[in-house]
Amino acid sequence: MAKFIMVVGTSSNSGKTVLVSGICRMLSNKGYKVAPFKSQNMSLNSRVSVEDGEIAVAQYTQAMAARAEPSVHFNPILLKPKGNFVSQVIVHGNPYEDKDYNEYRSKKDDFLVKIKESIDYLDKNYDYVVIEGAGSCCEINLLNDDIANLKVAEIAGADAILVSDIDRGGVFASIYGTVQLLPENWKKLLKGFVINKFRGNIDVLKDGFEKIEELTNIPVIGTIPYDETLVLPEEDSQALDGKRVFGNLKSPIEVNVVKFSKIANFTDVDPFSSDCLMKYIDFNENITGDILILPGTRCSTVEMDLMKKYGMDKKILEFVENGGIVLGICGGYQALGKMLFDEDFSEGDVGTISGLGLFDMETTFGNKKAIKNSTGKISIFNQNFDVSGYELHEGYSVSNETPLISLSKGFGNCGDSYDGSFKMIGDSYIFGTYFHGILENFEFRNYLVNLARSKKNLSKIEDDTYAELFNENMDKLSKIIEENLDFSKIIG
């Protein structure tokens, strides 16, 4: 039998995802078998579980924090927005149907059955399960249909923690208002409050702690200090709204990432951040980097249309003429080809469109989706790298270029034992792959960085700094939580 703990919030971006990650690592460090859980997540940022199913990146990252194999049971319902208020519904890792809100709500009881199946599975296989809520746990206009917050705690028999972000102001009002609006049966599940992102002397909060406990009969069990040095993966593309330049700001190598309108799996580029200066560029901006990334996207044809509209297509071709290094991942890889055929408009309103033409390749879209954990070998210029990644794509590509990866497992371009394409145009290197997570393979990542460094007569890098950075930051987060939160009333 597992002990269930739930983290709910007074609002979106209150710190639920990070807090769950830190608690998972803290409990794992104590020797417990731990699983994260989020009954329903809405995100275009997803990864592939051990069962070859699709789950949100946040739950995948939390699984890494917990040192657990990522499972579809960690995120039984995933909603992937497609536009016009319609989302693709993923159930236990597999595409179910496209539904708008009313259609989805009408199937709520069916989805609750799937959620309960996952809770039962986790109960039998783990010591602790740390549940993450969604948005505010008390949207009173949605309470009857909310299957992502305290309804889940009720089903699982979980003790709940309410977290609120003090950096926004009004933290005590947010906490009190949330508690007052909750139904009595859910209010009783709350065992403590957490104040997140606090700067300064905690003594100034003590009167507030006493007053809020007096008003609610629920204690503040801790305060998490604001720590700008923590480097943690972002949950979804909203985090990019104010994010432009990041990574190693002192690096002589600059990586530009085209900021697609429907960018997906944007964390693919994060492994570059420990060794390179990273910069997101809009369609109308100039390319200033040494390496250009065309990332994943929910709608490849839409992005191709926008690149043509704003002149980014011509800038990319000019970048190649000047010897630049280009990597396209999934939707970005598809855009590097000659044609993208979408006769059924499955990608959006654009339909069939010509691509950048850097690869002699054509992509055709359909309803069948490749969801795979994939492995293979890259063999180029007397270099051999074993690589792994994960595939999440609905198009298949026929390429006449040199394959980038010989597959040992996976679907690849079109189920033909190969993935991706590679070629040189003059002094320019062009790479494309369906492998999300390709840059987590440090040998290939360092190969790309060293290509750019060699063009500037700089020495090679050899270390796997990204993997080290992830675990260092998770352990640091775990320590912050253990030192600043009192979980004795919850985990004993």
UniProtKB/Swiss-Prot annotation:
The keyword rRNA-binding does not apply. InterPro entries: Class_I_gatase-like, CobQ/CobB/MinD/ParA_Nub-bd_dom, CobQ_GATase1, CobQ_N, CobQ_synth, GATase_3, P-loop_NTPase. Residues 252-444 form the GATase cobBQ-type domain. CDD domains: CobQ_N, GATase1_CobQ. Pfam families: CbiA, GATase_3. Pathway: Cofactor biosynthesis; adenosylcobalamin biosynthesis. The active site is at residues 330, 436. One of its GO terms (biological process) is cobalamin biosynthetic process. Keywords: Cobalamin biosynthesis, Glutamine amidotransferase. One of its GO terms (molecular function) is catalytic activity. Belongs to the CobB/CobQ family. CobQ subfamily. NCBIfam families: cobQ, PRK00784.1. Catalyzes amidations at positions B, D, E, and G on adenosylcobyrinic A,C-diamide. NH(2) groups are provided by glutamine, and one molecule of ATP is hydrogenolyzed for each amidation. This is Probable cobyric acid synthase. The lineage of its organism: Archaea, Methanobacteriati, Methanobacteriota, Methanomada group, Methanococci. The gene is cobQ.
